[in-house]
């Protein structure tokens, strides 16, 4: 739904499409908020997502029909980079206002990122509500659900360290909502 996709851009024929996986390398340590972001992006691009752990590092794997998994992976990378850039801008702004180095305070980054993800999720939901024909187009296909069930994944709880400051989450929310609506996000803006 993001990036102004139209119903004509999505293939709705009944022939069974091949389910594919696209891995996105995350390095050795995965911030918990990235797992949440991956799930939100995957749902918006007709995909499922899971995290894979190995000795070489961690990956998030997007599972979708056709090119859906590749598109979801690219969108995830762009969203994660935008979130990091916006958070850095937020930290610079808070330091200029005399709040010190907020990036080192416990829970601030997790809270801000959860706000960003909530804003992004709302922007995606608004795009669907503005064009109700898209609601059916972004439903995760049954073949993807069967593939995800067949993998035999263990579920774990995502635990993001947060702070109780509502202003931190609100700032992240506004940045995520703006990014989801297509506003240009750079390291200098936000």
Question: Can you say where each PLM-predicted feature lies in the sequence?
Answer:
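Extended, helix-rich structural scaffolds rather than catalytic motifs
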Residues: 4-190
């Amino acid at each position: 739904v993001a990036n102004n996709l139209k119903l004509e851009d999505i293939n709705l024929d009944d022939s069974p499409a091949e389910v594919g996986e696209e891995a996105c390398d995350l390095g050795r340590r995965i911030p918990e908020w990235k797992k949440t972001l991956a799930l939100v992006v995957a749902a918006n691009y007709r995909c499922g997502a899971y995290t894979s752990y190995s000795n070489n590092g961690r990956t998030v794997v997007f599972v979708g029909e056709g090119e859906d998994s590749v598109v979801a992976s690219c969108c995830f990378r762009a969203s994660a980079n935008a979130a990091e850039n916006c958070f850095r801008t937020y930290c610079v702004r808070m330091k200029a206002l005399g709040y010190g180095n907020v990036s080192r305070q416990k829970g601030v980054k997790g809270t801000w990122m959860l706000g960003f993800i909530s804003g992004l999720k709302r922007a995606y939901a608004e795009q669907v509500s503005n064009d109700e024909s898209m609601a059916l187009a972004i439903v995760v296909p049954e073949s993807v659900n069967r593939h995800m069930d067949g993998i035999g994944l263990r579920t774990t709880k995502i635990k993001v360290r947060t702070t109780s400051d509502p202003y931190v989450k609100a700032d992240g929310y506004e940045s995520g909502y703006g990014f989801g609506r297509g506003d240009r996000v750079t390291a200098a803006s936000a």
